[in-house]
Amino acid sequence: MGIIACSGEELLGGTLSRAAARIVVEKLRPQETIILCAPLFAAGGLERHGGQEERNFAKEHPTITIEGCEEECAKIAVDKYSGPPAATFNITEFIDAHPKLKSMSREDLGEDGMKLAEIIAEEIAKKVDELFIRK
């Protein structure tokens, strides 16, 4: 299953989305998931760099997008080039649901930010499990 995280660097949500994606892929569901490169996916046509491989993977396998803000760039790209994502998570919803967990900054999530990334990753892992059961 593919995971495409926000690649935005200006917002805390982008950093949290990438941290959560790494937790899912490296710790929680390493056998079931891979990270797809968002810029390469969007650029496409860069065969020497595997651009079509990213899009083709998302066409053939369920893909989850993790959005750092309401713009939903990853979801829009997956919709456009590979079909609808299997699920989309918006980091803003998690930030709003856990107001006591305050990240230090987008450059340094701190302990609370990493706890929030873990919570997000756990929810994504549940969705991975749900999608694998449906297959």
Explain the meaning of each model-derived region:
Residues 1-135:
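Iron-sulfur-associated redox domains of electron-transfer enzymes in respiratory
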